[in-house]
Amino acid sequence: RDRYICIPKSEKNLKSGTVTIGVSETALHLFLLPKLEKFHKLYPHIKLKISNHSTPQAIKALRKGFVDFSIVTTPLYCEHPLQSQRLCSFRDILIGGPSYRDIGFSPKRLRDLQDFPFISLNEGTATRNFYEKYFYQNQLVFSPDMETATTNQILSLVQHDLGIGFCPEALAKDYLDRGEIIEIPVKEHSNPRDICLLTDSTRPIGIAGKKLLEILMDSEG
């Protein structure tokens, strides 16, 4: 009687399969990596295909069916049949290199920082859109002197005293702790930003994808 063990079909399917994910750089580093580590330990045979996108690109990839789901940062705009669900929040700070240490002792108004060279992500990214709106709300124009493709590049450029820029606090922490960069407090506080999961309600997600979604939605995992 014990010779034949019934293995649920869902468990069989998890011996193989592929999950495709569109993810922005910030969402990858601040949220997704530890979740993927847990998923890979539980289901080592599942292949993961990860595409690095800006938020608008990730929305487009999901709409076209190139990915099973996307994980992105706000601000974002998605229409039916796409659905958005908040996963966590994060906070950006303004950072500068060693030569900017003198301006880091007290909060500064954005207007007083306009003459310093700003480093920013390229146009068409959620981060760039966020700061263009943030400056506009404070009657200013955000016109960076240097544009990069990734947040890590912003960190490197700031570290080498090429300007100041906004960066997620969690990504800057190690650099701050080592004294390689400094935080420049700003009087006009910016709102926290969210990392969100985007799915397409018209497209079914496979068993492996659903298992990964369970891990993504687990606040303790």
Go through the PLM ranges and name each one.
Residues 18-22, 70, 95, 119, ...:
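Short, well-ordered beta-strand segments
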Residues 1-12:
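Alpha-helical linker/hinge and terminal dimerization helices associated
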Residues 102-103, 117-138, 205-209, 213:
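Secondary-structure junction motif
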Residues 3, 38, 60-61, 86, ...:
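Well-formed, non-transmembrane alpha-helical positions, independent of function
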Residues 42, 53-116, 123, 190-191:
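Acidic, Gly/Pro-rich loop/turn segments at junctions of secondary structure
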Residues 31, 182-221:
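A late-sequence structural motif
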Residues 54-59, 63-66, 73, 127, ...:
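Hydrophobic hinge/microswitch elements
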Residues 16-79, 148:
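Central regulatory/effector-binding core of bacterial HTH transcription factors
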